[in-house]
A protein has these predicted regions:
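Nucleotide/phosphate-binding catalytic cleft detector across ATP-hydrolyzing
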Residues: 1-15, 19-202, 222-223, 260-289, ...
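Acidic-glycine-rich active-site phosphate/pyrophosphate-binding loop
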Residues: 30-31, 207-211, 327-344
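Generic beta-strand/beta-sheet core signal
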Residues: 78-80, 184, 207, 217, ...
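Acidic, glycine-rich loop-and-beta core segments that form the ion-binding/anion-interacting portion
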Residues: 193-261
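Extended hydrophobic-aromatic, low-complexity segments
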Residues: 224-226, 236-239, 309-312, 326-331, ...
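A short, acidic, amphipathic alpha-helical segment used as a generic capping/interface helix at domain edges
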Residues: 294-307
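Glycine-rich phosphate-binding/hydrolytic loop that grips phosphoryl groups
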Residues: 342-370
Length: 370
């Protein structure tokens, strides 16, 4: 029997990554193909260069089709938090008498709750925070339970039509017949955060290259999401501005920083081609610390805007490639925000890096939906 195989595209803030994969053993994946292209990214819900994005999408789509020998029908595209909004609704349906709840009843509960609030958005995902029966039992899945009433606190994720109109035609023109958009934030929440943790409440922060998305999760749904324009690339840009050096040299310099250890020398050495450069360690660290402080201020502001009172014991889970590899960044953010910080990543051998979180989360959700 042939295994189920899917293709996903992760539209990140610095590159587009396409993957073809199927389920492996012990919740792993078998990757059949992977293709990446850098592009200019996005900020505040707008792509910097839509035409370049379309060329990149067309290129990775062509690679996917070739890898599947022309048999690829559907591609699942992850929608970044910058292009989505979360809507929460309470819903209730009643029956003439007590009976077993079916999948159709659950669909009816969702249908009764949702009315599209704007013509500028399209519904891409819906999931439940919690269901409740007539005896006040709260369940993650009510199908098969007996009740006269079904209540639900429901979460809906909407995608900006601007994103769909930028992405879908480019993929269709390359030969993809069906393009399914799914929320990247929801995919990460369901894949990276254990169900028991989600049943209480969890905070996931995806720090990317240009943007950062804060998500509050409960049950199987998102209860809050906010994206702001500040990521790892801003830290690199601050180093560029401080030392007037090329961006790639600044990126290399940033990767040498260790905020946790006591320095034993006074300078970092960085090679750029055949040339060697030296930069004061303390000055570089101060630039990184100042940038991390700005990131922390944005995170604190986002959580305050949510209106949710999150218990102090709930850790701030951090993923993505923005700050995860900066040694000592986790401890600095923890001290600055006065909370426990955990770096989370896929529990998959050879792919257990925060930079893999988004694409593997999309792959997991796409396999569940297919």
């Amino acid at each position: 029997m042939q295994k189920k195989q899917v293709a996903v595209i992760d539209v990140g803030s610095s590159k587009v990554t396409a993957v073809i994969g199927e389920r492996g053993i012990n919740k792993t994946f078998v990757i059949k193909g992977r293709y990446s292209c850098e592009y200019d990214g996005f900020e505040n819900g707008t792509f910097f260069d839509v035409h370049k994005l379309k060329r990149v999408l067309s290129s990775v789509a062509t690679s996917l089709i070739k890898a599947c020998r022309g048999k690829l029908q559907t591609v699942y595209v992850g929608v970044p938090g910058d292009f989505t909004k979360v809507v929460m609704k309470d819903s209730q349906i009643s029956f003439a008498k007590k009976r077993k709840i079916t999948e159709e009843d659950v669909d009816a509960l969702f249908d009764a709750a949702f009315v599209m609030p704007s013509s500028q958005y399209t519904l891409i995902n819906r999931s439940a925070i919690v269901y409740e029966l007539d005896d006040f039992r709260r369940l993650a899945n009510p199908v098969g339970a007996v009740s006269e009433i079904l209540n639900g606190k429901l979460s809906f994720v909407l995608c900006s039509n601007y994103f769909i109109e930028a992405v879908k035609p480019a993929l269709e023109s390359a030969g993809i017949r069906n393009v399914e958009c799914i929320s990247s934030a929801l995919a990460e929440a369901l894949y990276l955060v254990e169900a028991e943790t989600r049943d209480r409440i969890a905070i996931l922060t995806d720090v990317g290259f240009i943007t950062t998305t804060i998500t509050i999760i409960q049950g199987d749904g998102l209860v809050y999401q906010h994206t702001f324009p500040y990521g790892g690339g801003y830290i690199t840009a601050a180093i560029v501005e401080k030392f007037s050096i090329p961006f790639d040299v600044a990126e290399n310099l940033k990767r040498k920083v260790n905020l946790s250890c006591v320095v034993t020398s006074s300078e970092f050495d960085v090679l750029d081609g055949e040339n060697g450069y030296f930069y004061p360690i303390n000055e570089v660290k101060n630039v990184v610390i100042k940038s991390l402080d700005t990131l922390c201020e944005n995170i604190a502001s986002s959580l305050e805007k949510s209106g949710f009172i999150v218990p102090e014991y709930v850790p701030l889970m951090v993923t993505g490639g923005g700050i995860s590899y900066i040694r000592g960044a986790k401890e600095h953010v923890s001290g600055r925000l006065n909370c426990v910080v955990e770096i989370v990543s896929p529990k998959v051998p050879l792919m257990d890096k925060p930079t893999e979180s988004n694409v593997l989360s999309l792959l997991d959700l796409a396999l569940e939906q297919k």
